[in-house]
A protein has these predicted regions:
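Leloir-type glycosyltransferase catalytic cores
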Residues: 4-21, 155-203, 319-344
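Nucleotide-activated donor-dependent transferases that construct or modify glycoconjugates
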Residues: 23-46, 217
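Active-site donor-nucleotide binding/catalytic segment of nucleotide-sugar enzymes
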Residues: 37, 41-43, 187, 191-257, ...
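Conserved nucleotide-sugar phosphate-binding/catalytic loop shared by glycosyltransferases and other
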Residues: 71-102, 325
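Nucleotide-sugar donor-binding patch of glycosyltransferase catalytic domains
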Residues: 144, 266, 294-344
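Donor-binding and catalytic core of enzymes assembling or modifying cell-surface/extracellular glycoconjugates
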Residues: 227-304, 308-309
């Protein structure tokens, strides 16, 4: 029932906002115009979607080094993710359940009118509420995130959800007179500090009690993205045989469940940054497509994303040595080969 209600809600929002917002490059920036305040809108509460904002924030930091960035989001995870981003100023947080917190929800939307921005950015072209929020905001320049057909030809990774908006934004900014730089799109980055990394190292050592490198598994995911217990058991058996010199452990989800029935050493935490510090000390992280897969990528660890139902082109991890594997097309032996290539 909840899924049906959400589907209806999205359909209504899409219809109401389909004609809202077109990015216009209304003349060139004059020489005295300085971008000091930027709004980025992503009204979503999911861990993965908020982590996928980190490359865009880094892009703004690089393009406008002295700008302050406000974020318009949903739920309470965003301040935790952006804890070490000094450029991030205000975070407007819509409640996850609007009808249970109607006053806070309305207040969140009206906060957009109480601030003036040089540039307002819709972080995801497909977000109806994102387009609506940018339309509602007070800004000199509004970027709604529309796709640019020519860019699809220029960039093989154009459809990746973290990269798409950056490519489109670079194109838009070049139209209003800013230099179009072609540097690599930033990686996801949790910006773990020294203490968090040291704490993660200690917790990992306390678990494995040796100095061998560690392979970390995350066996949970939502809905059809989740692989079965039998799949994980068969995969683990091959992994153990192929990597005898590695520790193999499991990071448990918030629900404290395991597709391996808790048969291997495991680590549990509800603290996203603690999890990130722990993962950062592992040699490689293997998971199906989910928010914790993006957390691993944002922690800097080579990440193997297992895909069977979702679009890997849009969601695959892309930091150093990370890769996605469509398990519909390869067997476990091939998966092991790809893991070896990443580790080497």
């Amino acid at each position: 029932m909840k899924k049906k209600i959400n589907a209806v809600r999205r359909s209504i929002m899409k219809s109401l906002t389909k004609n809202i917002g077109k990015s216009h490059a209304e003349g060139k920036l004059n020489q005295n115009f300085v971008v000091k305040r930027v709004l980025i809108s992503r009204p979503n509460h999911r861990l993965g979607n908020i982590l996928l904002l980190t490359p865009l924030v880094q892009e703004i930091e690089k393009t406008f080094p002295n700008a302050k960035i406000d974020l318009f989001v949903k739920g309470g995870i965003t301040p935790i993710i952006f804890k070490n981003y000094k450029s991030v100023d205000k975070i407007f947080q819509l409640p996850k359940k609007p009808f249970s917190n109607l006053f806070q929800y309305i207040k969140g939307w009206f906060s957009l009118k109480s601030n003036k921005y040089d540039l307002a950015i819709n972080a995801t072209q497909g977000s109806s509420s994102g387009r609506l929020s940018i339309s509602f905001a007070k800004a000199d320049y509004k970027f709604f995130g529309e796709d640019v057909e020519d860019l699809k030809i220029q960039h093989s990774d154009y459809n990746h959800i973290a990269k798409n908006t950056i490519y489109n934004l670079r194109n838009y900014l070049s139209q209003i007179g800013l230099e179009d730089h072609r540097s690599q799109v930033p990686f996801l980055d949790l910006r773990l500090d020294k203490e968090e990394l040291e704490d993660g190292k200690k917790k990992l050592h306390d678990l494995v009690k040796n100095d061998k490198k560690t392979i970390c598994l995350f066996t949970n995911a939502t809905g059809d993205k989740c692989y079965s217990e039998s799949w994980w058991t068969a995969f683990y058996d091959k992994l153990e045989s192929a990597f005898p010199d590695y520790n193999i452990i499991e990071l448990l989800p918030v629900e404290n469940i395991s597709k391996l029935n808790f048969n291997i050493p495991n680590f549990y935490s509800k603290d996203v940054r603690e999890m990130g510090g722990f993962i950062a000390n592992c040699a490689i992280f293997i998971a199906a497509d989910n928010g914790v897969m993006h957390l691993a990528s944002a922690s800097g660890t080579p990440t193997i994303g297992l895909f069977s139902v979702t679009n890997e082109t849009m969601y695959k991890p892309y930091n150093h040595k990370s890769l996605s594997i469509n398990t519909n097309n390869v067997d476990n032996d091939k998966v092991i080969e790809l893991i070896k290539s990443s580790l080497n």
